[in-house]
Amino acid sequence: AWITGQGLGWEAKKEEAFLRSGTQFSGAEGLALPQDGLYYLYCHVGYRGRAPPPGGDPLDRSVTLLSRLYRAGGAYGPGTPELLLEGAETVTPVLDPSRRHEYGPLWYTSVGFGGLVQLRRGERVYVNISHPDMVDYRRGKTFFGAVMVG
């Protein structure tokens, strides 16, 4: 994954990314599955950020990071995508009590989830992320996929 001007981009041919058995990938439309079946869908998104400057209500520093996996197209038809799986994590960064930094220390977390979903040929699955500017796009930190299990 990498940051683009319009959000998060996904890689389909580099590093550990691969496609098999007729699966197709389009950055704009997601992962197109080649046949009807039961699929294990998974998503793992690494996030990182920096705590805000000291002062104010601690709850104002909290941020809820959402990662959602949707289905669209194929036999499902055009129209509103359907939410299949969702993961969330609320982060309340700890301020640096020594105030050595203008901003607080860096924080890291991840949101991972997976589940079994019955999908049909031509349906596409894609990920929507609430805070693309906080995604950790370094190698192995952010990925999603589908494995046909039945």
From Swiss-Prot:
Signal peptide segment: none
Pfam family for this entry, one: TNF
Single GO BP term: positive regulation of interleukin-12 production
GO molecular function: cytokine activity; tumor necrosis factor receptor binding
Domain THD: 1-149
Subcellular location: Membrane
Main localization, broad class: membrane
Residues bearing attached sugar chains per UniProt: 128
Membrane protein topology class: Single-pass type II membrane protein
GO cellular component, one term: extracellular space
Keywords assigned by UniProt, alphabetized: Cytokine, Glycoprotein, Membrane
Known partners and oligomeric status: Heterotrimer of either two LTB and one LTA subunits or (less prevalent) two LTA and one LTB subunits.
Family of this protein: Belongs to the tumor necrosis factor family.
Reported function: Cytokine that binds to LTBR/TNFRSF3. May play a specific role in immune response regulation. Provides the membrane anchor for the attachment of the heterotrimeric complex to the cell surface.
UniProt-recorded name of the protein: Lymphotoxin-beta
Lineage: Eukaryota, Metazoa, Chordata, Craniata, Vertebrata
